[in-house]
C-alpha cells in the first residue's frame, strides 16, 4: 500500500489518531521503543505519530524530543510503499541531506517500519507513524536486522491497534450508557404523563399472546404491578360494551405493523 502525498493523507485522520491514542506516555509503548534502541545499539528509539502539520512521539527514548514540524519528518517518507525505510547515511540522500535534523541535529542513520492501523470498524488501513531508530553516525543495516525490525514493527502495530480499539470500545460504552439514560428519562416522563392524565398503555406479544402493561394500567385495574396477563384475561377488564370495539380494532392494529 502506498500514499502519494503522506501529509495530505494524514490530514484526513490525524485528529482521530490523536484523540484515540492520546499523547500521554505509557509504559508499554516506552518499553518497546527502549527495547528497539537497545537491540540495535542506537541512541534513539521511538514510536512516532505523523499528523498533517507535525510529528509527535507516543514513545521516545530521548525525553528532550517532543515533536517537530511535519516538513522535517523522516517517518512520513516510510509511507511510500516500502515495508521499511532504511537510510544508512542521511547526508547522501537527497530527500534528507538538507533536513535540519541532519544539518543541525547531526542525525546520520535512520531505520523505520511504518505502522498501519484501522481507525474504526469500517476504516481502511491508514499509516499513522513508525517504529523507528536514529543514530548519529552512518551505519549499515543487514538483512537479519531488517527482519528483526519488521517483527518489532508488527508488535508496535498490534500495540497501537489495541490501544485504538480499546479507546473506540470505551467510546461505544459511554454512548450506550448515554442512550440508556435517555431511554430511562423518556420512560419516567411517559409514566408521569400517564399518571397525570389517568391513562395507560399496553402492547401484545404475538409470540405467546401475552399482554405487557405500563405501570398506570396496573393502577387503573388495581392489580399488583408486574402480574402477567394473557390477552384473554386482559380483555376481561373491559366493559362488555367496549369489547366489540377492541375486537374490531385489534386486527387492523396488527396488520398495520411494519417490519
Regions found by a protein language model. Give the residues of each.
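Amphipathic alpha-helical coiled-coil "transmission" helices that mediate dimerization
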Residues: 164-185, 192
Amino acid at each position: 500500500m502506498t500514499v502519494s502525498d503522506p501529509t495530505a493523507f494524514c490530514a484526513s485522520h490525524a485528529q482521530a489518531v490523536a484523540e484515540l491514542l492520546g499523547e500521554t506516555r505509557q509504559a508499554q509503548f516506552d518499553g518497546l521503543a527502549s527495547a528497539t534502541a537497545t537491540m540495535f545499539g542506537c541512541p534513539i528509539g521511538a514510536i512516532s505519530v505523523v499528523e498533517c502539520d507535525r510529528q509527535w512521539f507516543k514513545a521516545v527514548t530521548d525525553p528532550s524530543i517532543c515533536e517537530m514540524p511535519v516538513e522535517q519528518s523522516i517517518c512520513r517518507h516510510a509511507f511510500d510503499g516500502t515495508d521499511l525505510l532504511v537510510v544508512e547515511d542521511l547526508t547522501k540522500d537527497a530527500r534528507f541531506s538538507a533536513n535540519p535534523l541532519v544539518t543541525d541535529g547531526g542525525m546520520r542513520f535512520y531505520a523505520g517500519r511504518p505502522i498501519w492501523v484501522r481507525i474504526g470498524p469500517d476504516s481502511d488501513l491508514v499509516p499513522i507513524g513508525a517504529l523507528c531508530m536514529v543514530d548519529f553516525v552512518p551505519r549499515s543495516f543487514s538483512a537479519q536486522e531488517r527482519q528483526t525490525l519488521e517483527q518489532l514493527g508488527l508488535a508496535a502495530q498490534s500495540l497501537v491497534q489495541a490501544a485504538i480499539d480499546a479507546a473506540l470500545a470505551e467510546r461505544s460504552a459511554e454512548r450506550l450508557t448515554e442512550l440508556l439514560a435517555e431511554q430511562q428519562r423518556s420512560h419516567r416522563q411517559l409514566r408521569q404523563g400517564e399518571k397525570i392524565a389517568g391513562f395507560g398503555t399496553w402492547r401484545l406479544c404475538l409470540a405467546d399472546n401475552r399482554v405487557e402493561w405500563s405501570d398506570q394500567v396496573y393502577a387503573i385495574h388495581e392489580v399488583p404491578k408486574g402480574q402477567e396477563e394473557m390477552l384473554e384475561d386482559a380483555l376481561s377488564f373491559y366493559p362488555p360494551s367496549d369489547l366489540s370495539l377492541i375486537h374490531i380494532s385489534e386486527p387492523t392494529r396488527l396488520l398495520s405493523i411494519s417490519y
